[in-house]
From Swiss-Prot:
The keyword Nucleotide-binding applies. Homodimer. Heterotetramer of two Top6A and two Top6B chains. ATP binds at N48, D80, S101, R102, G111, Q112, Q113, G114, I115, G116, I117, S118, K435. Belongs to the TOP6B family. Relaxes both positive and negative superturns and exhibits a strong decatenase activity. This is Type 2 DNA topoisomerase 6 subunit B. InterPro entries: HATPase_C_sf, Ribosomal_Su5_D2-typ_SF, Ribosomal_uS13-like_H2TH, Ribsml_uS5_D2-typ_fold_subgr, Top6b_C, TopoVI_B, TopoVI_B_transducer. It comes from the Archaea. It is an enzyme of class 5 (isomerase).
Length: 621
């Protein structure tokens, strides 16, 4: 009797392991080209290093080294000073997909699924046929454990080739070495260098060193010794929970009554709120949750929407903060203006999130190109699929002309700008498993829009101020060309010395006048008065610096003194309201006429140079 076709087909059907699936679909995880495969590998290892260091409270010190081992092959070594990994866990952490500690944790973290670094190990063994080398140490008194591993794709279990103890100079940390088919590229936005530079900006507490295949070393120094606030794990929030998820929670709970189940399974539900939800759902608070079916679960979800429940807590998030975004941009860019904004936390589908934006303008940034958008999710740079990301869509939808930037044909504006956008959440809604772009969630897009507009308004104010200062500068240039000639002619007619025109220029311009008046007492001593007069309509707070090669006496008011080699910097902190005058005085015990003529120009710190007459000026930070 002939075997039915259905039975023949059934013999061919079998399950596959997750490792086999990703072995044949590696592009899903970001291993679709030689350059990108290397970036993805470095990204996964650096993410793990940063997460481990932060959880242990250690300031990260990370080394990334890339070596060419053939025309199409590289070896990449990533080393960190983190807490290390205990011996028993090393094979599973690096050679078993979907193995990790963060998948069920509701808090902000870089990695979550437990796929990333194992996928890199899988890619290395597929393309180079090589095992991965791992060295890890947990304390100065413990030995370092060395493994050589591969992944058994049939079982998704680690194959251990070498397991031994070694000496290692580090007190604690982890090193991973992989050889793979990949390409190291330079001069592109999508490169190892740009990825690490972007990582350094949003992780200013980290020190990252890159050694490229040519042996060149680039160090991204940390800008702060302050660790980020640790993110706390929270319970799920009832807003946006799906029916199947709730049914699973009801089935597996250890609680025997519905009200306690609600209270201890969700955040922001207390005893009174739990009873109110039960009442709204028409369910007995004493009923056993295990007895509830699909119909009752749907009633609970409807009750969640009816009852007012507080928003989820936000201590599960760890935003960078405006000050550290500023420092990160300042450290890695050369610009004239930086503005930052951190929004208040918001919620989508029960998931807390926060949006942060930084904007850098001017300096050596290209003026005729589209602005550079730096996208981040949970402090991780997003280098690919910019056009499919909600951050880009938010940028394109803003009318940039009203903020001082050209936007020919709409879309991304043109100008010397870096726009940094960071979305932090316990569950960032990526568009794919490769985590390249954030999905178009309306509330997230709205928060991005508001944060961008906040820094854009600051840019508009800065550009307006710069335009006014430029006009003042042009006016002052004309005045300082005409007045000296006029003063010289009048002095010649009257047969007098040419007067100092600075007070006249300051009065015409409405500037702050700062000038030095010297009186030689004839006994070898000199009285010096620094006269300050505010001819403007605004109050100013600033510092006056007097750099001298000698010590002074009798200074009033008493200045702060900074020794700089053989010179002394005398510093006065001054506040001058509109129309007010100040006098700073001191005495020099002995000085010749020649020395007095060589006194350096006074310096005013804290005011633009266009607003000061008679002294050098700089705005400062």
């Amino acid at each position: 009797m002939e075997t039915p076709i259905a039975e023949e087909l059934a013999k061919k059907q079998k399950s596959i392991s997750v490792a086999e699936f990703f072995e044949k679909n590696r592009q899903i995880l970001g291993f679709d080209s030689a350059p990108r495969s290397l970036i993805t590998t470095v990204k996964e290892a650096v993410d793990n290093a940063l997460d481990a260091c932060e959880e242990a409270g250690i300031l990260p010190d990370i080394l990334v080294q890339v070596e060419r081992t053939g025309p199409d092959y590289v070896t990449v070594i990533i080393e960190d000073n983190g807490p290390g990994i205990v011996r028993e866990q090393i094979p599973k952490v690096f050679a078993k997909l979907l193995y990790g500690s963060r998948f069920h944790a509701l808090k902000q973290s870089r990695g979550q699924q437990g796929i990333g670094i194992s996928a890199a190990v899988l890619y290395a063994q597929m393309t180079a046929g090589r095992h991965t080398k791992i060295l890890s140490k947990t304390s100065p008194t413990a030995p370092a454990h060395y493994y050589e591993l591969m992944i058994n794709t049939s079982t998704n279990e680690p194959d251990i080739l070498v397991d031994e103890v070694r000496d290692w100079f580090r007190p604690h940390g982890t090193q991973i070495e992989l050889e793979m088919r990949a390409a190291y590229v330079k001069g592109r936005r999508q490169s190892i260098y740009e990825y690490l530079k972007a990582t350094a900006i949003v992780n200013p507490h980290a020190r990252i060193t890159l050694i490229d295949p040519d042996g060149n070393e680039e160090v991204f120094e940390r800008a702060t010794d302050k660790m980020p606030e640790p993110a706390e794990e929270i319970l799920p929030h009832p807003e946006g929970i799906e029916l199947g998820t709730l049914m699973k929670m009801l089935h597996y709970t250890e609680r025997q009554k519905l009200a306690p189940f609600l209270r201890y399974s969700f955040c922001k539900i207390g005893l009174l709120t739990a009873e109110e939800i039960c009442k709204a759902a028409g369910l007995d608070p004493e009923i056993d949750p295990h007895a509830l079916g699909r119909h009752e679960a749907r009633k609970l979800i409807e009750a969640f929407e009816k009852v007012k429940i507080m928003a989820p807590p936000t201590d599960c998030l760890s935003p960078i903060g405006e000050d550290l975004i500023y420092r990160g941009l300042e450290k890695e860019t050369t610009v004239d203006f930086i503005a930052t904004s951190t929004r208040k936390p918001a919620v989508y589908s029960g998931n807390p999130f926060v949006v942060e934006v930084g904007m850098a303008y001017g300096g050596n940034l290209p003026k005729e190109e589209k602005i550079s958008i730096m996208r981040f999710a949970n402090r991780v740079p997003l280098l690919y699929q910019q056009g499919g990301c909600v951050t880009t869509h938010a940028v394109e939808d803003i009318k940039w002309k009203q903020y001082g930037l050209n936007q020919p044909g709409g879309g991304i504006p043109v100008g010397p700008v870096i726009l940094l956008i960071h979305v932090a959440s316990i569950n960032v809604p990526f568009t794919s498993e490769s985590k390249d772009a954030i999905a178009d969630i309306p509330v997230i897009k709205e928060e991005i829009d508001l944060a961008i507009k906040e820094v854009a308004r600051k840019l508009k104010h800065y550009l307006s101020k710069q335009s006014n200062l430029k006009k003042r500068r042009e006016k002052e240039i004309i005045i300082t060309k005409v007045l000296p000639k006029l003063a010289a002619k009048v002095a010649h007619v009257l047969e007098k010395d040419v007067p100092d025109i600075n007070p006249v220029v300051a009065k015409i311009m409405g500037n702050l006048l700062v000038h030095r008046v010297i009186k030689n007492n004839g006994d070898g001593t000199v009285d010096v008065a620094i006269k300050v007069k505010n001819f403007g309509t605004s109050a100013y707070s600033f510092r006056v610096h007097e750099m001298l090669p000698c010590k002074v006496s009798g200074a009033k008011p008493e200045p702060k003194v900074v020794t700089m080699g053989n010179d002394y910097d005398y510093v006065w902190d001054i506040s001058a309201s509109a129309g007010s005058s100040k006098v700073l005085s001191y005495k020099i015990e002995s000085a010749s006429e020649e020395e007095l003529q060589k006194l350096p120009q006074l310096i005013v710190e804290g005011i633009e140079e266009e607003l000061v007459t008679g002294a050098k000026a700089f705005k400062g930070v």
